[in-house]
């Protein structure tokens, strides 16, 4: 079962694991969207995201990075 846009915690943790040297505070949503869609376990419609979803994922990633 793949990751969906609603899995913000799991996606944020996966981004932290996949990009350990990236400071999430410097990431643009457009880049983050591409990285999420490229995650091996991601299995959802790339067009189904929105700013609120990306913000939730970013907050998890920031939390993991601290």
From Swiss-Prot:
UniProt-listed Pfam families: Fe-S_assembly (PF04384)
Molecular function GO terms recorded: ferrous iron binding
SUPFAM superfamilies membership: IscX-like
One cellular component (GO) term of this entry: cytosol
Example of a GO biological process term: iron-sulfur cluster assembly
UniProt cross-references to InterPro entries, sorted A to Z: ISC_FeS_clus_asmbl_IscsX, IscX-like_sf
Family: Belongs to the IscX family.
Function according to Swiss-Prot or TrEMBL: May function as iron donor in the assembly of iron-sulfur clusters.
Quaternary structure note: Monomer.
Protein name per Swiss-Prot or TrEMBL: Protein IscX
């Amino acid at each position: 079962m793949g990751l969906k846009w609603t899995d913000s915690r799991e996606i944020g943790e996966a981004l932290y694991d996949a990009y350990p040297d990236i400071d999430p505070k410097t990431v643009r949503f457009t880049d983050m969207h591409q990285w999420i869609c490229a995650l091996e376990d991601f299995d959802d419609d790339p067009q189904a995201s929105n700013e609120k979803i990306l913000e939730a994922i970013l907050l998890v990633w920031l939390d993991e990075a601290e």
